[in-house]
Amino acid sequence: MATTFADQAAIAIENVRLFNEIEDKSRQLEEASQHKSQFLANMSHELRTPLNAILGYTELMADGAYGEPSEKMVGILQRLEANGRHLLGLINDVLDLSKIEAGQLELELSDYCIQDIAQTVRSTLEPLAADKKLAFKLELAPALPPGHGDGRRLTQVLINLVGNAIKFTDAGEVAIKADANNGSFYVSVRDTGPGISAADQAKLFQEFQQADNAITRKKGGTGLGLAISKRIIEMHGGRIWVESQPGQGSTFTFTLPVIVERQVEAA
């Protein structure tokens, strides 16, 4: 019996040691993740500042502030500005994600109008749809109530969703639909693109993940926009999901309370 007790005591001591070791490793990993997020936030800020200056001077040169540019030079400057803005968008995505992971992203809660957000997104992205000869529809329910939340961040989410829809749709239409029911907004973005397989849908909202097919590789992207959108919606106490089948287009939908009184912290 003494031997059995000694064996059990040894096992218990070893279990405690293993538990403490796992706890220490978990703490170290969490600290490393926080350091990484802080580094990315600082680095993104340092990159964004000079890039904004480069874009500003490029725009001034294209507008003739330093002398009338030739037609060839205008084309070069326009391509330079377009690529610079694309890079700035990537940096902003990394900055947002690092802020979210570090717990530094705060919602700025105020009144907003979901109709105005939808109209703003359409006016911003309709030229891209027109370039591809895509119809751009708004399907807004009448008399939608005023919302309370972070309207700027919700605009960012909708721009991400509509931008993706336009990027991956080569014919047909893109539509924004908005409705309200039982104290919640229901907003969806529908497209007539190639659709997404069930296997790819499962990873779409993860950081740096995209649908694994030739179309995605051709269109490009970082796989950050949907992950950021998911976190923003969850911070509003809402959720986001996709319904799609290959060859039948996709519909991304998010729902959130009409009135958000406080930010929901990440679990």
Each language-model region and where it sits:
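Conserved glycine-rich
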Residues: G172, G237-G238
